[in-house]
Regions:
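N-terminal amphipathic/basic-hydrophobic helices that include classical n-h-c signal peptides
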Residues: 1-13
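Basic/polar, acidic-poor N-terminal "presequence/leader" segments
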Residues: 10-44
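Low-complexity intrinsically disordered segments
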Residues: 21-32, 144-186
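Alpha-helical repeat scaffolds in large eukaryotic proteins
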Residues: 29-36, 53, 57, 104-107, ...
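Alpha-helical rod/repeat scaffolding segments in eukaryotic adaptors/tethers
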Residues: 42-45, 49, 88, 112-122
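A glycine-rich, hydrophobic loop/mini-helix early in the fold
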Residues: 46-85
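Aromatic- and glycine-enriched beta-alpha-beta binding-site module
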Residues: 68, 74-116
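Conserved binding-pocket/active-site segment within a compact domain
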Residues: 100-165
Length: 186
């Protein structure tokens, strides 16, 4: 009986350990490299991602690396990973929407600055966010995108402070609105 109880305690303590943002980025980078090299299966990666995105810092670290990095994971998401991301609920939807807004606005910023490489990187993140949002829970995505759209185009709602925090201007907000509509068009 003791080994079972010990195993349950160990499992519980592992679940209680939430990575910092920095740790989450490092762990995610290692996992994606293993997955890209076919050293771990879609299912193993999905289980790990499910655990990672259970905390806000874990999810933030995961998305920074997976959306902006060189791994092709976000370009061809395995069903098992989609299932874990959908199962993570509103937190993943929220971060995906915020990443969509930020990458879209930064693409405008980099275009203005004439930095084509950075613009392309921001556009890739934006495109990955659009595709991801099309795969997540539709009702949650719709509600969250409507909230962002209200702030970007009508300067109302909860996301006004988020957009103001980053100092986005009218052209950037219009681009964010266009990206929101791009999710719906898919």
């Amino acid at each position: 009986n003791r080994p079972i109880a010990l195993g349950q305690e160990l499992k519980r303590s592992m679940a209680d350990q939430q990575p910092t943002f920095q740790q989450a980025m490092e762990i995610t980078a290692a996992w994606l490299q293993q997955w890209d090299n076919e050293e771990i299966s879609d299912e193993v990666l999905a289980d790990r991602i499910g655990e990672m995105v259970a905390s806000r810092d874990g999810a933030r670290g995961f998305f920074v690396v997976s959306l902006a990095g060189e791994s092709v994971l976000m370009d061809r998401l395995p069903d098992a990973v989609v299932g874990q991301l959908r199962g993570a609920g509103a937190g993943v939807v929220d971060l995906s929407v915020r990443n969509l807004a930020m990458s879209t606005a930064m693409a405008v910023h980099h275009r203005r600055a004439g930095d084509e490489a950075q613009q392309a990187g921001s556009e890739r993140v934006s495109s990955r966010c659009i595709e991801l949002l099309r795969l997540l829970e539709p009702a949650e995505v719709k509600e969250r995108l409507e909230q962002l759209l209200a702030a970007a185009l009508d300067n109302r709602g909860e996301d006004v402070a988020f957009l103001e925090k980053w100092g986005y201007d009218a052209e950037q907000k219009q681009a964010i609105g266009d990206s929101v509509y791009a999710v719906a068009e898919g």
